[in-house]
Amino acid sequence: MLEATERVKEDARAIISQIQNNGYVNPAIKPTDNKLTVIIPFLNEGEEVGRTVCSIRETVGNKVDIIVINDCSTDGYPYQKDLLPLNVYYIVNSKRQGVAASRDMGIGLSKTPYFLLLDGHMRFYDSQWCEYIVNLLTENDRRLLCTQGRYLEKVDGVVREIASRTYKSYGAYMPLIKGHTLTEIVWKGNEYAPEADTEPIPVVLGAGYAASKRYWNHLRGLEGLRYYGNDEAYISMKVWMEGGECVLLKKVVVGHIYRKKSPYKRYSADELFNELLISYLLFPQSLWCVEFATLCKTNRDLFLMALEKFQEESKRWVALREYYRRNFTKTFRDFTEVQQRLCSQFLEDFKKKDIDVKGIAQFVSEKPLEEKGLFDGTMGQILWLCIYENSSEDHTYKDHIKALWDGVAAAVHHKKFPCNFSNGLAGIGWGLIFLKEHNMIEDDISEELNLIDRQLSCYAIQKDKDLSLATGTGGILAYATARKMYGIKNHIPAEWIDDNEEMLMKAAQMVIDESSELNALVYAMRYIALCRDGYDEQDYPINLGDWMDVKDFIPKNPRRWTSVLTDTTLTTSTLYLIYHKKLNRHGKIQ
């Protein structure tokens, strides 16, 4: 009842505001000789809208067209009065559309080949910025340009630089940290090309973005986003995946007044919807399932509301995803390579680490484990030693690895294992597929997988109340997902999976409905997506990071080391070995 009352009040304020701001829904925008249109959507900005436009006119005069879009403000401020003498096209949305839709609308209405998107609280400082932007886009219009920000605040009506903001930023990037929202972006602190006036950046941020109308339409703009949130991540990834580039203009400095509070509702089902949509459209299958699972774990009620909205237009999103796959020349994996190249903070820390991986390898080889499984047994040691060998090209332990595997294989043949993932058949099977997928073993593994399948066929998954990855349904689904993917890619049928697909699907849905464990949720969603949508050719091979918690600590005293895969010594050194290989490839360390 309270929410309904608030909606009525909001609608009333919107009607009053529209009466006070008699703009146009579809104004007739006349072509000019200008090359650039500035587009400013806003909501409840007060005097700042007019001051932003004044700053534009004071620096470049009438060299740009300006479209100002009032997204159904409710503050009663007389915007039209401020804007009337400033030669702008002023539009009032009769219903709130949100930032993304308002930006796309403004671009659609513009008559110039290029445009600049701004917020309604910005300042300009020189008279060359328009010509500079136009020249860069004329030279190459497969670009999204980002202005350099000056961080401002407004205190008692006075606009000033934020004194505490002493560091510079150079665009943004996506950390892509499991357990966090994968579409989240953060400021990038390192400068990639200090000697240049421009430099490529992974993601634009700061609310000053320029592009060509032709290219924006080819990318389908911000299509699908609701109200507020994630514009920058969405459009930046699309630019890089299409084959274009995001570029920071260090010479074009634009002041941005950072507000204490957003006028748009934050952390709503609509914002979660945007995160679901972007991940589904642009991420490979395994990663969008991680994003869905993370949002489900974080706030299940809000996730279910967002998911319902998403599923209402599922056919539209499938078609849009297919459009991107047809028209983009790069993949999400290529985008992450761009990030690693441009963001030294991703990899430079590993330069400074002094991890005795040779010593750890010797330690592991000398510490046999009684258990045979993946988490704290021999299979985990085999995986670590194979990763070490693959990264370091040190083949000292080749015979030792074979001997370890012979012991595990013998135990599998003698049916001495539980079915679970942590210390049983599911984990051993997953480990075998991992080694084969990453070309760390040459032997055919079909016999071992078929044997594991036959033993797992006796497991009553639908009766198991344990939904966890380690010892329950989540772990069986982890193996089933890897097994099905391996079978599809290598044209090898997985009869246990095919014969029990309905039962496994029901088990996966039970995990989604009842579990709060991230890894279990991820594999439940991955299994359902794989069965429903098929294998994604752009997906990653299975990896330890799919389920292993990343740690960054190794005891200095070797007496405190352990040879268990899931303990800090091996998880940290595994991360180091993987990134050491990437650092070498990017020329960062030798």
Where do the PLM segments sit?
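Terminal low-complexity segments of carbohydrate-biosynthetic enzymes
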Residues: M1-S17, E48, L205-G206, Y267-F346
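Conserved donor NDP-sugar-binding/catalytic core segment of glycosyltransferases
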Residues: R123, S127-G179
